[in-house]
Amino acid sequence: MVKIFDADLIKGHFIVNDNGKRALVDTGCPYIINDENKYSKPHGELYLNDARSNVDPTISEFRGLEYFAQHKVLFDYKKAAIIVADQGDDVAPVHPVAEFAISGLPERIFINLAIEGKVRKMVFDTGASIANYLTESIAKTGTPCGTVEDFHPQKGKFPVDLFSLPVEVGGETVDIPFGVQPTDIDRDVQMSGAVGVIGVGLYKNFQVLVDLPNKRLVLGRY
C-alpha cells in the first residue's frame, strides 16, 4: 500500500495527520514516541515535550526509525508531502540523481557525502530542519553566510553561525550552509564516527527517499 500525506511544514519539520495522531516524522529519532510509551523510551518524555514546546503543541507522536524500518518514505518539501510505501511497494523520486548506502541502523542513518571534495560520514536527520552541522574544524573552512537560532532537546535554544560549503550530488555541486553544534552535542556525533548532521540542506534541494528495508537513500531533482 502507498499513502500520500499532506505535510504541515513547521519550522521546516514534516508533520502529518495519520490514524488519529499528529506525527512529527523525524529520521534523527530511533523510536516511535507518544504519550502511551514516552516513559519507556530513552529521553522519550523530553523529546516529546521539546517538540511540543518548540515546533507544535498539538504533536502527539514522534515518528522515528522504528516506523521507517518497515516502510519506504519519500520527503517532498516543495509539495509539502510525504509518500509512504509498504516494504513490497514501489516509490521513487521523479528524477533520481544520486543513491547512497545507509549504515548505522537501527540507531541512526549514516551516509557518505562528498563535502568540499572529501568524502565525509554524515548523519541524515530530517529533524535538522533549521541548520545542518559539521564539526568546527570543517565547517569554518566554508564561507560565512549568516546566523540562525536553533534548538535541541538537551540544550534549549542557541545561535548558530553558518558557513557555506560545496556538496557534490550526482555529478553536480550544491552550496549548503553548515553550522557548529554545541560542544557536547558535536562530541556525541563524532563519537558515532560521523563528522556532522544534514537534513534541511538535502530535502530543500532534493526529493529524498529513505528506503530502510533496502538500506539506501535516494535523492531526486525537484
What are these model-derived regions, one by one?
Residues 1-222:
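Pepsin/retropepsin-fold aspartyl endopeptidases
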